[in-house]
Amino acid sequence: MIKKIYMLLLTVLGMGAISSCSDYLNSEKYFKDRLTLEKTFESKDHVEEWLAYAFSFIKNENYEVTTKGPSENSFCFSDDMYYGDRDKTIDATKNELSYNMFKLGEYDENTYNVGAWGACYKGIFQASVFIHNVDRCQEMADWEILDYKGQARFVRAYYYWLLLRRYGPVPIMPDEGVDYTQSYDQIATPRSSYEEVAQYISDEMLQATKELQYDRRTDNYAIGRPTRGAALAVRAYALIFAASPFANGNNDEYAQQLVDDEGRRLLSSEYSEEKWAKAAAACRDVIDLDVYELNIVNKSTSDNGPSERPTVTPPADGEFSKQPWPKGWTNIDPLRSYRTIFDGTILPANNKELIF
């Protein structure tokens, strides 16, 4: 009798478990709520979310080497800021982000933010999907779609720029992406040469200038979005690097060893003066936009406390000391002209030195 009751209990429990498992495994109701790619890009809100996600990989692993840290200054895009309290020449125990460490080449692939490679390619993938699908949106004007596409194209090329600076020659992924269900041998993408990556960045940034709708932005809420000026500036940077001795006629031992899977040199062994000409022309394109200029504060004799002291006369500098701006500094305050860029006096949208 006891055995029969025991078997009955097991049967009831088993049926309950099967019923529970059946409910648990019945996930169809959840998949019905999932948005398809086509449906996602019909909504402007979802379009903006996707674009923001594509940009999100610029943070974290891709902080500039001179960014002090996530809590102090996590959105610094400058590559020339310097923090003395993180310099091993001052304190040997504080070398986490020493500018000198990078300036002097005292680092390796394991030194700083080793996750940058994966983060960049994730961003590249998200931007590529966006570029191929944003035209589906019916809630945006044509000019908005074009501008958003230009922003995505900019950030995709910007990720390649970050990769080029950090790793040198890298694989350029197919624009339409890859079929991850195929074998590794079918989807493996070899490294492109340094020149090819730089040229890709140049071409993509040039295309972005045809899509982006602003030379520079004057809205403080949109100041972080890329512009034609930003695209042309990154293009100029990439071409300057490609023209440099590192990638232009480099026959050092390491350059000879840097080859792809078929033995092709990835750093050019032949010097080309034309590369410098292209880089100079690209820099000129930024200047010719005529939307950027140095911030100038006029010379002052007033003494209104710490915020405005009389102009300190700089050391003599030949003819520059005797002429008004822009040929000299006799009518400006050089110190305050520089300081007001960083002390909060000028909002980002009003800072005509700010490109991106």
Describe every region a protein language model picked out.
Residues 1-7:
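Bacterial N-terminal signal peptides that target proteins for export
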Residues 223-234:
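Amphipathic alpha-helical protein-interaction segments enriched in hydrophobic
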Residues 39-50, 56-67, 87-167, 184-223:
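Conserved, well-structured interaction surfaces
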Residues 17-20:
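C-terminal motif of bacterial Sec signal peptides marking the signal peptidase cleavage site
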Residues 22-94, 170, 228-229, 240-356:
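An aromatic- and glycine-enriched ligand-binding surface/loop that stacks and positions planar moieties
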Residues 153, 232-238:
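TPR/Sel1-like alpha-solenoid repeat signature
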Residues 11-14:
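Classical Sec-dependent N-terminal signal peptides that target proteins to the secretory pathway
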Residues 178-188, 259-268:
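Aromatic- and acidic-residue-enriched carbohydrate-binding clefts of CAZyme catalytic domains
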